[in-house]
UniProtKB/Swiss-Prot annotation:
Keyword annotations of the record: Ribonucleoprotein, Ribosomal protein, RNA-binding, rRNA-binding
Species of provenance: Vibrio cholerae serotype O1 (strain ATCC 39315 / El Tor Inaba N16961)
Protein name, UniProt field: Large ribosomal subunit protein bL25
Family named by the database record: Belongs to the bacterial ribosomal protein bL25 family.
Function: This is one of the proteins that binds to the 5S RNA in the ribosome where it forms part of the central protuberance.
């Protein structure tokens, strides 16, 4: 399973809200020896794959052309809408 991710340079609550209004959501990739990286993912692409068991085993994120193998660590969902607010990924 592979997703295209975009590096985020605009951080903070306001930037995250603007990002969610465009159909993307914020996420972070951490772990291993590399520094944590803030990214954004397409909401619809991820939501369509979240009901599959493979989603929670291993994912490949393409971040600016570089493939990173990750596993979802945490998912923050909206209180009553079927939306993802934020995700944490850990490198494997």
């Amino acid at each position: 399973m592979k997703f295209e991710a975009v590096l985020r340079t605009d951080l903070g609550k306001g930037a995250s809200r603007r990002l969610r209004n465009t159909g993307y959501f914020p996420a972070i990739v951490y772990g291993g020896e590399a520094a944590p990286v803030s990214i954004s993912l397409n909401h619809d692409d991820v939501m369509n794959q979240m009901d599959k068991p493979e989603f929670y085993e291993a994912i490949v994120l393409v971040i600016d052309g570089q493939e990173v193998k990750v596993k979802p660590q945490d998912v923050q969902r909206h209180a009553y809408k079927p939306k993802v607010e934020h995700m944490d990924f850990i490198r494997i």
